[in-house]
Amino acid sequence: MKKLLSLPPNLVGCFHDITHLPADEWFCTNDPVGTKLGSGGGTTWLLRAAYEAEHGNQTFDEWLASDKRLLLHAGGQSRRLPSYAPSGKVLTPLPVFRWERGQSLDQSLLSLQVPLYNRIMNMAPHGLNTMIVSGDVFIRTTSPLPPIPEWADIVCYGLWLGPETAKNHGVFVSTREQPTQLKCMLQKPSVETLASLTTDHFYLTDIGVWILSDRAVKVLMQHSTTEGHITEGPVTAYDMYGQFGCALGSNPTIADAEVADLKVAILPLTGGEFYHFGTSHELLSSMLAIQNLVNDQREIMHHDRKPHPSIFVQNADIKIRWTQSNRNEWIENACIGEHWTLTRDNIVTGVPDNDWTLTLAPGQCVDIVPIGSNQWAVRPYGFNDAFRGPLADVEFLGNSFASWADEHGIGIATIEGGHDLQAARIFPIVDNINDMGIVLRWMLSEPNLDEGRHLWTIARRMSADEISNEANLSRLVSQRTHYRAHNLPMIARNWQHSVFYQCDLHNLAGQYRDNDIDLPSPMPSSAPLLTRACDAMFRSEATANESASYEAQAFGLLREGLTADALRVSQRPRLSVYADQIVWGRSPVRIDIAGGWTDTPPYCLMEGGNVVNIAINLNGQPPLQTHVKPCLQPHIVLRSSDLGASETITTYNELAEYNRVGSPFSIPKAALALAGFLPQFCTDSYPTLESQLRAFGCGLEVTLLSAIPAGSGLGTSSLLASTVLGALNDFCGLGWDNTDIGHRTLVLEQLLTTGGGWQDQFGGLLPGVKLLQTDRGFAQTPEVRYLPDTLFTQSDYKACHLLYYTGITRTAKTILAEIVRRMFLNEHNQLAMLRDMKQHALDMFDAIQRMDFNRMGRLVGRTWQQNQLLDAGTNPPAVQAITSLINDLCLGYKLPGAGGGGYLYMIAKDEEAAARIRRILNEHRPNDKARFVEMSLCQKGFQVSRS
């Protein structure tokens, strides 16, 4: 999705340099200087500027339809939030949320806004290509997003808010009979009007998130273009909300037939929250509300020592101690020297290193803005200053400007731009830190300080508007970066009470490298194991010389945490069959249809996992089988029917070689070890394997059959391991249930260093269609919710489920290692994708529970899209060549597991489409191994029996 930003003029020229965002994805411009276009005219101007910059030979209609776009209006003067007026409110730095993982110390309002908008636009039907939003709000939702109707020309999101809040905003009115269709839009209606509506109407409060079809965009542009074509005529002022919005609906308040003809859907953002960052007060109140959204101590990942929760410090050098009397303090990109005194309602931004003696009374704020190469604008202001109105009538520094001027001996009439405080030239420009402190003292609290009066009098002075227009934003950001780099070692050192290890450690490691910061001191062994593992992976990312050893340490600690409980309980295998009996274990394989990867440690240990999968037989049989039988000699014989290999084990050392590269029997060796046939896993002690087997009563012959090619994506290795463990459990009387077998499979995979999650083994150990869920923590015991199997077994549906072996193989280990690495690092984008996948599994659960075949099929397609976002190699060209042949015939398809090859699972639109898919792929086989395999739902899961 392309992002089109309307920004303050001074920010446009350096936006990409200071944000490091790619210019080909982020386009920015400003409204014409000195012209007020309104939100509608501004939208037209922004679209026209973007079209001129990138259209090539496309017509405007072609360009508009060629991509999805986010239009973000952030070009205001920021009168009521002076601290971030120069860089634009949209780039306001916001602290890491104390309850959130994967955020960055350098995050901004913009970086927090965009992910939700991306999610919404990913759901938008074809033709709804343009989203228009405001730049000074943060919106989040705790519930699934509602589906977007395909019939709408305009989709508007709203919240259910009370009349005391709604009266200050636009509201969408609908009838109770058609609650998603707009009747009319009202701007700032009275409480009485809203009360009268509720008897037979609903109303939603506008949150400024609109999606427009190409048709609606052109209607909006035509109304803000006075003559000629919408890409060429003069742009005029037009309000998208007060004029365009009020002309929408079945009974609009403004008559305009062309606008009223547009079909409008209004959608409640269920579980939505709306936080405004438009004023100094809102900067603190909104952030405090966000930080306090979660008070459950189990959800809060660090425990700070602030004396009050409304104290926010970022990118700063603080040399004072906070006290209980401090409230509503915002310090960012600033140095607070040891001789400063702060009280409450203070915002301090941009202040360079200093040793001033300075007191800020309640409500006094300071903003220092770099000008040119070596000067600064000194801007004190009041917490509630609105910067609007003539100097004779306006408030400044918490009092009237007139009284401030009188106290400081300044004649209002002598001030240039006195018609409006925003235009008044009252802020002095200085070229050294000492003068900066002196003139601040004079302006804030020492009107009799002659030196300060003299400096103010002789200085060049700027207005608030001029400061924004002339600010050197590169210097401003450079100072911020310097302070942040200075903070990092302290934040790391104070890790138990800071956000360090809940941050995006990939981002943090980059900051350590870029600023050549020494790594933190080694973490104590008493620290939580998972934190130590994340610390090791952070060090691997931050350093080049020891990257591999730190990575190995991280995986080793993960392995220790996952295996500790199982290894703490040793086993005492005892022969539980007759001398001529054979134990036969057999298992289906699994197809993950939603939520795969969320079961993978360490993600599932941090946040839990949700997976919907199905257990299937191939060609009518469980494809994974293990036979265990006694043998007279005191040794262990391992055989593989499909590989035609065998190995005889006579010593503990030979059995302990389950990690030997290239061994076809790594899985059964590790399974035998976990069953108690290695000393470290056995309750009793024996000098040799031979002596243990003699005491056991016989040797063992273990025969494996995997009737599936390697790299199938069907969970083969995990389920083969659980099949072997299940058969040994019965043969040796170990007393494990399916949950124990699943856990020990996870341990086995850790012993083999292949890693992996829990959904593979539980997907086949347990029958049918099910949702598997775990909570955070090392005890990953899935809760199982079985689903109706009608969509898989009823004849007309069953024929639509197709399984095709592509003949392309790809092992999952290297894919897994890189994705797991990013899990350790709390990498923001991947974490967001995993959370989306986790919710997606619940959507799939709902679709199957409702027996909605079409929705289920489409959701499988969404699963495939998610997998590709997580790992681009999931869908190589060879696979794309296959799917391109049948794309239009499927509701959805995916490669099970890690992808890249193996089997292709398809859900055809209907039986006729299924027949056509079979014909097409049989006629266009990509290789001599490619073939259809008959799949059927397994209703029994893992089975074990005796001869």
Where are these regions (language model features)?
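Stable alpha-helical structural segments in soluble proteins, enriched in small hydrophobic residues
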Residues: 46, 553-561, 671, 719-731
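Short helix/loop capping segments that flank catalytic or ligand/cofactor-binding pockets
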Residues: 14, 80-82, 141-142, 165-167, ...
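C-terminal nucleotide
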Residues: 445-694, 743-753, 761-895, 905-947
